[in-house]
Amino acid sequence: MLCSRSSWCGLILLLCWTGSGYLCGGQELPQPVRVLDVMRISADQPPEAGVVTLTPPPLGQGVSCDVLVVGAGTGGVAAALAVAESGHSVCLTEETKWVGGQMTAQGVAALDEDRYIESGGATASYLKVRGAIRAYYQQHYKLSPAAARDKHFNPGNCWVSDLSFEPAAALQAIESMLKPYQSSGLLRIFMRTKAISAARSGNRVTSVLAYNFETDGWTSFRPRYVLDATETGDLLPLAGAEYVPGAEARKETGEPHAADDADPKDSQSFTYTFVLARDSRQEHRIPKPPDYEKRGDAGFYSFSVDYSNGKTLTYRMFERSPGTPGSFWAYRRLVASANFVGRNMPREVSLINWPGNDYCGPALLSKDADQQAQALREAKITSLGFGYWLQNEAPWAPEPATHSRASSGAASGAGAPRDIQAADRRGYPELELVPSVLGSKDGLSQFPYIRESRRVKALKTIREQDISALNQKGTRAIFFPDSVGVGWYPIDIHSCSKGNFSIETRPFQIPLGALVPQGLENLLPAAKNIGTTHISNGAYRLHPVEWAIGEAAGVLVDFAMDHDVTPAVVAGDDRLTEQVQIALVDRGVPIFWYDDVAPETPVFRDAQLLAQRGIFGPNQTDLHFNAGGSVTLAEAVTALARLLGWGAVPSKRAPAENKLALEAITLLAAQGYLPAGPYAPGELGRKLQWSDLQMACAKTGVEAPIDQGEFKPATRGAFAVWLAQLYRRTLGTANPAPSP
């Protein structure tokens, strides 16, 4: 009997192998399958050394959990935490040795963030990781006086990120957050474990079979929900989900920068990062990797970067070239020696994640393990080739005698050996590849930094024009009523077909609909595999956004289980979506863009919900909420009318003559919320006093804040607190408010 996705083919533990042509039901043995083990890929070995041939057993060890999170990267960790914190059981798998993804195993430990990350652009749990990373250095080392005074202490003092660090710091932070749930039994982590197949019954994934590369053991997971948090969307093809690889055509998406024709093989480059230290006492040249001349002689390796806007900048190794933001060394430096004092100082190291070690090859998203292995090996050779070029052929320039340790990165002494100071010298042989920082044997990251995944065909697809500053002329990107998170980063495309390019964006939201696949009930994306396009993914793939995606996915499935509904049902119901948004905001997840309302601020929850529901808060000139500012009478009466669901009052700010505010007053007065007036149009621009709301307080039973005088102007923060109390009382009774 041939196995199909709509049947178990026998016993519940017997698995479906339709994707590989397996037979099940116990009538025939499963056929061998080739499986990629990313940790076995080596530049010194043929690609087949990174592929194992496995024969899945008809029965695997059965493990049941409420939610299976496949992939313990940035999104997977956030999702697992959200589910476990709700009291549901979680199984979390990871094919490398480290949890944390971009922050750890992929080596991108200089966080790609927006400038408001600490004041409104990140979730509370993401900020907790950042705080723990800083604490790691404060606890293990003695900081310099300047670093100790710096509230925003950056261990690496790099110029591309506000927080750069060794992966070990993030690993410790993340593991400490996961540990309580492991101890309680709510969370089980399966390291070096990879999903091999998935079985379906109708539109539900019923089991996922996974293999452990260290124990050779097989596990059959039987969860209620599956979250695909893999770096390349591995569960999507295994589960038969509809997805998009590569680039869409302009006629499909209407995106200005989309190509005329779709190209499934046109994905962004990926990168094996590596870490260098500087030891001026000796040389540390690595062997020339295979096929080095193919890239080296072609000028592939360079300090110059083409920014696709007609501007090319050429950097120097240890000093800043005119017109550049900083030196090559300080670009993604993870530890700056100038930040530390005393004998027990960490070694200064720099992460190398540069166009020179980007690799282009479509095979990474192939279903063929041998093709994937070939691409990964070539990517490793590319990165090692860049390291070789830096040591042997990079343009050399003497450093100024007055250089500082912070700017030069000379952790092992200010000068360089006599032979390196020669005018005709090329390369920096004092640069040392440091494998221990990345936990690998060859000095390269355990997993390549993935910029583009398979992307699920979701209920909502985010397009370039939804977030691009060229299309969105306001202070924020397009408003998504079903927002479950926020992010902000340029559309940053490391293109393999048309050259790298970057598009400015507006601060954007993550719509719930982008997390819900078409045609599947219990499989959700939880990383960079959500409903984006080849282009819009360039802004949604970064650390804090991927974390927010994973956290939202975790909260969504938690809500679905508690209320016995599917995510698709939630996505189609405004009130259910609203309840998910409340759950997110209550745990410190911003869903609306403010740059001055961080999760720890007292007014965070109220400001977020009122703005997202189109009731009160935002303006069209900046990202501020301005909690200490005043509220006009016109703003207050219009907000109250919106909250009560009187759709006759639009969400846009009233015109100068305040006709809309006067209409709101008429409606409110007729229902006993306000005195009948009359109100002169000019009076509506005055500051709101709590005495103006006496009748509304009496009618609703929501009292004004006790610390606010009756005739004192109400602050925006205090008014939001009062209004939010009323909002929570009216949940389920008012009509949905229009968008702000």
Locate predicted features.
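N-terminal propeptides
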Residues: 576-740
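Flavin (FAD/FMN)-binding glycine-rich loop and adjacent Rossmann-like elements that form
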Residues: 29-48, 58, 102, 190-195, ...
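Boundary at the C-terminal end of the N-terminal hydrophobic targeting segment
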Residues: 23-26
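Bacterial N-terminal signal peptides that target proteins for export
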Residues: 1-10
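Conserved N-terminal/central alpha/beta ligand/cofactor-binding core
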Residues: 32-38, 88-89, 94-193, 197, ...
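Beta1/beta-strand and adjacent pyrophosphate-binding region of the FAD-binding site
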Residues: 59-73
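Bacterial N-terminal signal peptides
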Residues: 9-21
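Mature catalytic domains of secreted/periplasmic carbohydrate-active enzymes
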Residues: 74-75, 84-127, 134, 212-221, ...
